[in-house]
Amino acid sequence: MPYTLSDAHHKLITSHLVDTDPEVDSIIKDEIERQKHSIDLIASENFTSTSVFDALGTPLSNKYSEGYPGARYYGGNEHIDRMEILCQQRALKAFHVTPDKWGVNVQTLSGSPANLQVYQAIMKPHERLMGLYLPDGGHLSHGYATENRKISAVSTYFESFPYRVNPETGIIDYDTLEKNAILYRPKVLVAGTSAYCRLIDYKRMREIADKCGAYLMVDMAHISGLIAAGVIPSPFEYADIVTTTTHKSLRGPRGAMIFFRRGVRSINPKTGKEVLYDLENPINFSVFPGHQGGPHNHTIAALATALKQAATPEFKEYQTQVLKNAKALESEFKNLGYRLVSNGTDSHMVLVSLREKGVDGARVEYICEKINIALNKNSIPGDKSALVPGGVRIGAPAMTTRGMGEEDFHRIVQYINKAVEFAQQVQQSLPKDACRLKDFKAKVDEGSDVLNTWKKEIYDWAGEYPLAV
C-alpha cells in the first residue's frame, strides 16, 4: 500500500532533532556543555546513566495504559504490563524487601505528588499530619505553612503541625515531638527531610507513631540510593509507607515510587484477631484514577534499568564514596572555620551556615554560579525568612558519579570559600541605601577578572571528568 501522506511528512516524523529543530537541539547542547564544565553540588541532582537515557527515548512513550497490569482501560498493553511488573520486582529487590510484606506503585510521576497521593489515600480532608518544619530541614510536601499563609497544597487540604530540631544541636527533638504528637494525634507522622544531614531514628519514630495511633510514612527521596546500597540504615523495618523520588541519589529518571505494607498491621487486644493493612488498594486508587491518568511508560522502563543498576556491587561502591566525599566536605569546611548545621553529616550533603560570615545563601549562590559551581541557597534553623536564607546546601552525589574523590571535594570547598570572601567584599562595598540582593547582583555583573579566572579554572577542571549522555 502506498504511503498516503507526503514525503515531506514522512521526513518530518523520521528525521532527527538536529535536522527538524536545530533551535531546540542547540539549547540542549548548550545545557550538556554547562553540565560537562560545571561543578554540580545540588544535593537533589545527579547524572543518570547512558542506558537510562536509552530507555527514556523509546516508543514506550507512545502507549497509553491507564490502569494497572492485567486491568487496563486500553488494549495493546501486553509488553507495558511486562515492563511495569519487572520494574516493581526490581524495586522490591533493590530495597531488600519481599512481595509478601511490601508492594510498590511505580506510576506516580514525582515526589511531591506521590506524598499528596499517600495522604489522600489514608486521610480525609482536614485530618492531621506532622512533618519536619521546612526551615529545620523538612520539605514543602510535608505540610508547610507560615503564620499567615498555607504554602503547600498539603497544608490546604489537611491540617499540619510541624516538629522541630533542637536549636542547639540541629538534631530532631524527638522528646518534644513525642509530647506534641500524643497531644495532636496526627493520622500520619512523616519522617523525611530535604536539608537535614543526620540519620533519622526510625525506631523512635515508630514508637512515637504507635503512641499516637499514626501511620509512619518515610519520605526517603534524598537518601534512597544510600539505603538501597545498604550504606545507611533502612526505614523499611519500621515504616508503614515509604515514598521516594528516583532521580536523586538513586540516579534514575525523574519519577517517584510509593511502597506500602502488606499483611498484618497489629493484633486486636480485645479479640486477639489480626488487623491487616489496608493500604494497597487505597494508594493505587489515589494514584490512578485519583490524581493521574496514564502513566509514563518510558519513565517506568528507565526506572527499571536504574533499579537493576542499584542492586549491583558497583552501585554500593559509588554510594560508599558519596559518604566519603560528604565527610570530606565536612572536614574541609570545619578546617576553614565554618559552622555546619548539626555539626556535620551522616549522609550525602552538608548544610553550611553563612550567618557568621555576614552574607546569606542567595549571594553566595550567585557568586558560585558565576564561576561554574551550582549549589543552592537554603534556610537553616533560626532563619526568620525563607527569602533571606542563612545557609547553602551542598551535596556529593552528582560529582561523585562523575568520578571525583575526597581531594577533589577539598578543592571544591576552597573555591566556595573564595566565593564567600568575594561576596563579603562586594556586600561591604555597597552603600547602605543600595545593599539589596538586586544591588549585589548588579555590582557582581559589572565583571571581575578574579571571577573570570576562577571560572576558567573550574571549566577546565570539571571538563576532565566524564559525563554520560
From Swiss-Prot:
The modification Phosphothreonine is found at residue 20. Pathway: One-carbon metabolism; tetrahydrofolate interconversion. Its cofactor is pyridoxal 5'-phosphate. Pfam families: SHMT. It comes from the Eukaryota. Its EC number is 2.1.2.1. Its main location: cytoplasm. The modification Phosphoserine is found at residues 26, 429. There is a cross-link at residue 456 (Glycyl lysine isopeptide (Lys-Gly) (interchain with G-Cter in ubiquitin)). The keyword Translocase does not apply. It catalyses: (6R)-5,10-methylene-5,6,7,8-tetrahydrofolate + glycine + H2O = (6S)-5,6,7,8-tetrahydrofolate + L-serine. GO terms for molecular function: glycine hydroxymethyltransferase activity; pyridoxal phosphate binding. It is an enzyme of class 2 (transferase). GO terms for biological process: glycine biosynthetic process from serine; one-carbon metabolic process; tetrahydrofolate interconversion; tetrahydrofolate metabolic process. GO terms for cellular component: cytoplasm; mating projection tip; mitochondrion; plasma membrane. It is found in: Cytoplasm. Homotetramer. Belongs to the SHMT family. In eukaryotes there are two forms of the enzymes: a cytosolic one and a mitochondrial one. Present with 67600 molecules/cell in log phase SD medium. This is Serine hydroxymethyltransferase, cytosolic. The gene is SHM2.
